Amino acid sequence: MSADVSTKPRGSLPIPTAPGESNECYRVIRTLGEGAFGEVLLIVNNKNPDMAVAMKKMQITTQANTNNIRKEFLIQQKLSKVGHDNFIRAIGMRTENGFHFLFLEYADGGELFDKIEPDHGMPTAIAQFYFRQLIEGLKYIHDCDIVHRDIKPENLLLTTSHVLKISDFGMATLYRNEGKERLLDLSCGTIPYAAPEVCAGGKYRGPPIDVWSSGIVLIAMLTGELPWDRASDSSYAYLQWLGNNNLDENPWRKMDVRALCMLRRILTDNVHRRATIEQIKTDPWFTHNYGKLEMTYGRPLKRARYADENSPDCNISSTQQADAVSTAKRRHLETPDKVAHVERQNASFSQPTRTEDLLLTQNIDMSQNNTNLLERMVCRMTRFCTKFDVPTSYRQLIHASEHAGYEVRQTADNRLLVTFREVSMMVTLYSLKTESRVMVDFRRSRGDGIQFKKMFLEVRNRMNDSICVDGQNFLEDCGYVPRKPQFVREANA
């Protein structure tokens, strides 16, 4: 169907509630993400697998750790009381046997960064479609007196009906209490997306730093690259931007004048002049009609019926969507029975306490786009099919990765951990039972999402002769990779 990008994605969807005191009512399907202090698991109701919830499992270590985890839950619980389509809702929390369990809404469409093509980005209409949702989500969060402090594509999840959801509130905090705003001083976030006042290490206002980060996200969507490594005097590219000296260079020359003018208002180091969310919503780029998108919508997941011992009355609105292909249709995938333990990446569910800890959040993937063993597979772009069997494909994969200059380590049967500098990706080979093909699946393990996509493209290009020509259509038909949204420009646009 055709959807005007000026409108929101489809609205009211099912309402899940949290698992109850007994673990017998649900089972773990797979690991969604891992970190030094815990993991995120996909769990489903035993009686109805369509009832899916993300469960964040964190070990109790110190009182400070417990306080930070509870703070994260209370923030999301506060946001969930009224609810909004554009953030991941907290469903419940439980503590038992030395672990905290945080139950969250599950977004089955992957991460926003997966839609960003390195060095190209995405069509302006699609970028505008997602950016409008990001701004609506931030407006709601800020209106609830909360600031996120780590807005980046990896923390922006999608549903199969193209609803964008802000996730990971581990660095979020209350910036206003009873109408009185307070200055913040904790240096946190991810460096390339962090505002200059955060990088400087001083006190700062809450909402403007989220606005800044949203501008960097928009640049990534429009151009497929980041403008600088750090918004500080140590970055030549950043100083050139402040001096208005490099607009004929990348990434600026990849965008139109409207986008550039809006970004000038967003990415100013003068906090008092930086655009507010209300000003962004009336900006010519934001309101311009760039066209229509051909959207396909998934079937809503059924409502999960659970109870939570800490939040017995928890009943939160959700926007979960079922996969376009039924679980039964996806059972022609074979995965290795034995999975070796993989060292958990450096991660933090709580808030960094030093400026140098900003780097920490670049080495973690607590997102919901990671897949290990399959029963329900998130649709993702970073997959392809080969013409050969698993052993041959495995050797070719190692050869292509090593010749690209990447470090390759086998972690389990048919699984490889491929690393280049600060970025790692887990590669898994799946034998298709009903097809004489092997599907190669890449997922980001740590590091920047755009750099991960560049690594994937490098390996894929080196294996081009081995890729099955009709494999892409097969993966699209099965729902393992997304179909590209159709863009229709209006005659008067």
From Swiss-Prot:
<dbReference type="GO" id="GO:0106310">
    <property type="term" value="F:protein serine kinase activity"/>
</dbReference>
<protein>
    <recommendedName>
        <fullName>Serine/threonine-protein kinase chk-1</fullName>
        <ecNumber>2.7.11.1</ecNumber>
    </recommendedName>
</protein>
<feature type="binding site">
    <location>
        <position position="56"/>
    </location>
    <ligand>
        <name>ATP</name>
    </ligand>
</feature>
<feature type="domain" description="Protein kinase">
    <location>
        <begin position="26"/>
        <end position="286"/>
    </location>
</feature>
<dbReference type="InterPro" id="IPR017441">
    <property type="entry name" value="Protein_kinase_ATP_BS"/>
</dbReference>
<keyword id="KW-0723">Serine/threonine-protein kinase</keyword>
<feature type="compositionally biased region" description="Polar residues">
    <location>
        <begin position="312"/>
        <end position="324"/>
    </location>
</feature>
<keyword id="KW-0547">Nucleotide-binding</keyword>
<keyword id="KW-0067">ATP-binding</keyword>
<dbReference type="GO" id="GO:0005634">
    <property type="term" value="C:nucleus"/>
</dbReference>
<dbReference type="Pfam" id="PF00069">
    <property type="entry name" value="Pkinase"/>
</dbReference>
<dbReference type="GO" id="GO:0007095">
    <property type="term" value="P:mitotic G2 DNA damage checkpoint signaling"/>
</dbReference>
<keyword id="KW-0418">Kinase</keyword>
<keyword id="KW-0808">Transferase</keyword>
<dbReference type="InterPro" id="IPR000719">
    <property type="entry name" value="Prot_kinase_dom"/>
</dbReference>
<keyword id="KW-0539">Nucleus</keyword>
<feature type="compositionally biased region" description="Basic and acidic residues">
    <location>
        <begin position="333"/>
        <end position="344"/>
    </location>
</feature>
<dbReference type="GO" id="GO:0005524">
    <property type="term" value="F:ATP binding"/>
</dbReference>
<feature type="active site" description="Proton acceptor">
    <location>
        <position position="150"/>
    </location>
</feature>
<keyword id="KW-0963">Cytoplasm</keyword>
<comment type="similarity">
    <text>Belongs to the protein kinase superfamily. CAMK Ser/Thr protein kinase family. NIM1 subfamily.</text>
</comment>
<keyword id="KW-0131">Cell cycle</keyword>
<keyword id="KW-0217">Developmental protein</keyword>
<dbReference type="InterPro" id="IPR008271">
    <property type="entry name" value="Ser/Thr_kinase_AS"/>
</dbReference>
<dbReference type="GO" id="GO:0035402">
    <property type="term" value="F:histone H3T11 kinase activity"/>
</dbReference>
<keyword id="KW-0227">DNA damage</keyword>
<dbReference type="InterPro" id="IPR011009">
    <property type="entry name" value="Kinase-like_dom_sf"/>
</dbReference>
<feature type="region of interest" description="Disordered">
    <location>
        <begin position="308"/>
        <end position="348"/>
    </location>
</feature>
<comment type="function">
    <text>Serine/threonine-protein kinase which is required for checkpoint-mediated cell cycle arrest and activation of DNA repair in response to the presence of DNA damage or unreplicated DNA. May also negatively regulate cell cycle progression during unperturbed cell cycles. Required for checkpoint mediated cell cycle arrest in response to DNA damage in germline cells. Essential for embryogenesis.</text>
</comment>
<dbReference type="GO" id="GO:0005737">
    <property type="term" value="C:cytoplasm"/>
</dbReference>
<feature type="binding site">
    <location>
        <begin position="32"/>
        <end position="40"/>
    </location>
    <ligand>
        <name>ATP</name>
    </ligand>
</feature>
